[in-house]
Regions:
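Active-site-proximal alpha-helical scaffold in enzymes
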Residues: 87-118, 156-186, 263-270, 336, ...
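Conserved catalytic cysteine-centered active-site region
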Residues: 26, 59-110, 143-150, 217-256, ...
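N-terminal amphipathic/basic leader segments beginning at the initiator methionine
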Residues: 1-17
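Short, well-ordered amphipathic alpha-helical segments that serve as non-catalytic structural scaffolds
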Residues: 28-44, 68-72, 97, 148-155, ...
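N-terminal extracellular/periplasmic Venus flytrap/periplasmic-binding protein-like
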Residues: 10-13, 24-25, 30-34, 168-269, ...
Length: 400
């Protein structure tokens, strides 16, 4: 099999998923084009050599419908010969897009692939696709599908994670993210300009510098009402060892909704067609799993554990981890179960503070991981995401 090299990893800032957000004036095609143009303008990418664009996108509705990987490639002026594939594996989508690109190059089918994700939650709201698993109780029950927040509260209840622990995790995420932003550590960000060439967004917008434990403690649980409408009773039936479901998740310790796009340029060569741009990292292993769908967000723990086992490695062998903060309890559980040291885990904050643009999140996290690996001069790292229904993906990368 061919070795697969990451030549470049770039992303837009994460904008607030509101009409007032810094990215909301651009449509998804325009936002992706900012990143495509960056590769071309730097002469990293020679378009005639590009084989395929593969993107993750969760809410494939409206402006994000119609195979946005292919349509955005055409919009950007890529050759007609460039294939396009859009996938939805919930919040693991962009890492799974990357995995598909990795496999196509490793197998010899392709030489150059752009893989990543897009989600414009300000313009295409979460759940606006009206999928039956979210809107029809019978379908959800038959498929054993729960909303993400309900799953997070279940994980907290099963693992005896307190509200205070969740709030402390959220506060730490905010503090680390703010420090990283003020220290200009997010080097992978490509500033976004509008059609009039005015700067609209150059940094992640979701960080809340004013966050305190006192403020977090005053927020009301977000999913208690949903629980009282029958979800709690169903979860207690499935997990009889529990006496109650503890609703510890609030807007303060849950991931912030965001707009963003991210792309990773993959190659079978150690450099792009322009030899100036050499491989930043290689992909050394991938694990794709699905856990019990009733647990909803346990996939990143299982995927990380599987990846380590398959690569014959332990947590001690990994220099740094970027793990999806899919609600506070999920990341607390990952850290506890896998015994990841604090100084190796999400060292520059996570999506609770920085924002969670669903279909783009995994490769946004990967770009930040590579930035940090280069900054502190370490050799390897793992990025992992959870998705709904127990989905999980983890990827091991190694610097050249």
């Amino acid at each position: 099999m061919n070795q697969v090299h990451i030549i470049e990893a770039i992303r837009t800032p994460r904008g607030k998923a509101k009409e007032s957000g810094g990215l909301s004036d651009l449509n998804p095609h325009e936002l992706l084009n900012v990143l495509y143009d960056d590769l071309v303008n730097k002469e990293i990418l020679e378009l005639d050599l590009l084989d395929e664009v593969i993107l993750g996108c969760v809410t494939q509705q409206g402006e994000q419908a119609g195979n946005i990987a292919k349509s955005s490639s055409l919009y950007a002026g890529h050759p007609d010969s460039v294939s396009g594939l859009t996938i939805n594996r919930f919040c693991s989508s962009s890492l799974d897009a990357l995995n598909i690109g990795y496999l196509k190059i490793a197998s010899g089918q392709h030489s150059f692939v752009i893989a990543g994700g897009i989600e414009m939650m300000s313009r295409v709201p979460m759940l606006s696709d009206n999928a039956a698993i979210w809107t029809d109780p019978k379908t959800a029950l038959d498929a054993r599908i729960f909303m993400m927040g309900s799953g997070a509260d279940l994980i907290a209840s099963l693992n005896k994670i307190s509200r205070e622990e969740a709030d402390l995790l959220a506060l730490s995420s905010q503090q680390k993210a703010l420090k990283a932003q003020e220290s200009d550590l997010f080097k992978s960000i490509v500033p976004v300009f509008n059609k009039s060439k005015n700067l609209t967004c150059s940094k992640d917008e979701c960080i809340r510098p004013e966050t305190t434990m006192d403020g977090l403690s005053k927020l009301k649980p977000s999913f208690e009402k949903l629980g009282s409408q029958g979800v709690d009773a169903l979860q207690l039936k499935y997990f009889p060892e529990l006496k109650e479901i503890k609703h510890i998740h609030t807007p303060g310790n849950s991931p912030a909704m965001a707009d963003a796009a991210s792309i990773i340029f993959l190659s079978k060569h150690k450099h792009s067609s322009n030899a100036q741009y050499k491989s930043r990292a290689t992909i050394k292993g991938v694990a794709v799993v699905n856990d019990d769908p009733r647990l909803v967000l346990s996939g990143c723990k299982l995927a990380t554990s599987k990846l380590l086992k398959e690569c014959n490695l332990s947590v001690k062998d990994i220099d740094i981890f970027e793990i999806h903060e899919a609600f506070a309890a999920t990341i607390i559980n990952v850290q506890r179960e896998l015994e990841i040291p604090e100084d190796k885990l999400n060292v520059n904050g996570g999506v609770i503070a920085l924002g969670h643009p669903m279909g783009a999140t995994g490769t946004v996290m990967l770009s930040s991981l590579i930035d940090e690996m280069e900054r502190i001069d370490v050799s390897n790292g793992i990025v992992a995401t959870s998705g709904a229904a127990g989905a999980g993906t983890a990827i091991l990368i190694e610097r050249e």
